[in-house]
Swiss-Prot record:
Region (Disordered): 137-166
Protein name: Cold-regulated protein 2
UniProt cross-references to Pfam families, sorted A to Z: XRN_M
Source superkingdom: Eukaryota
């Protein structure tokens, strides 16, 4: 069947279809949500016939539409969106299991100064420039135990021969691990951010 908004378009076309395109663009008619399937806003006329019987194909080689059933108009939003009369908006609730709460365990003892931080952070010093790899596990683990073997713990090792003679460079990886760990459940792959700290020699 026809869309409930089609009578509005035909009515608008019969009233103002004879105007020039410039004048037609200034005309708009407000929609009745109860009569237009819940649509708020305004409609305006397109240029030309809103529902031509023959619709020319825009692609070379394809046949024209000889029995067009499509009606066209321009939709303009209203300034303030509103629900239909009698419609009650439901309160948005999170889907079950859609997201895991990030914990704040250990943030204070690890020196996290951001009071909004809701993550558990581990810091380890590793050799080399750049991220050594994405550490993850699929089983319960000790949050204070070494996490993976892709980046060895080297507390006092400098970066190498390119280190300045006046000090050593160390890389620190910060592991943001959502959920798991201390609760006994498996942890998700961690997001690793790396920074470089220059330690002067005493």
């Amino acid at each position: 069947g026809a869309h409930p908004i089609s009578p509005y378009i035909y009515s608008l076309s019969s009233k103002f279809g004879h105007l020039a395109d410039k004048d037609r663009n200034e005309i708009k008619e407000q929609l009745d949500p109860s009569a237009s399937g819940g649509m708020n806003g305004y409609i305006s006329l397109c240029g030309g016939d809103p529902s031509p019987l023959v619709f020319r194909s825009p692609v070379d080689g394809l046949e024209d539409i000889m029995d067009n059933q499509v009606i066209c108009s321009i939709y303009k939003r209203s300034r303030s969106s509103q629900l239909r009369n009698g419609k009650v908006s439901r309160r948005r609730a999170p889907a079950s299991g859609a997201a895991r709460v990030l914990r704040r365990e250990g943030a204070e003892r690890e020196g996290c100064s951001d009071t909004r931080c809701r993550c558990r952070r581990r810091r380890r010093r590793v050799q080399g420039y750049g991220v050594a790899g994405l550490a993850s596990c699929d089983a319960p683990h000790d949050p204070d135990a070494p996490h993976g073997t892709d980046a060895p713990h080297t507390p006092d090792a400098p970066y190498g021969s390119d280190s300045p003679a006046t000090g050593n460079h160390y890389g620190y990886q910060y592991h943001y691990r959502p959920g798991g760990g201390a609760s006994g459940g498996p942890c998700s792959p961690m997001i690793i951010s790396t920074c470089t700290v220059y330690v002067p020699r005493s």
